[in-house]
Amino acid sequence: MFYGHYDVQPVDPVELWESPPFEATIRDGEIYARGSADDKGQVFMHFKAIEAHLKKTGKLPVNMKIILEGEEEVGSANLDDFIKAHQSELSAD
């Protein structure tokens, strides 16, 4: 099972940003964008790894589940209830 989140911290104070907070920027060969490291980059890496494995083998070797949520930065208030309500669907190897 892979877990990831797509929410990000608030932009305030916006005047401290070196580039527009809602616009990806490349500086010195690095990507600067809200969520690019926490956690959208990790989520993207997981999807690309799955895609590469499927292209090479045609199937995944395990029963894989992916949970993506949008409340991690504020404590994931609904995640526990969601997992409890969907235990059978979330069963993975």
Annotate each PLM feature.
Residues M1-D38, H53-V62:
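Acidic/His- and Gly-rich active-site-bordering loop/insert found
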Residues A37-D93:
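Acidic/histidine-rich catalytic neighborhood of metal-dependent amide-processing enzymes
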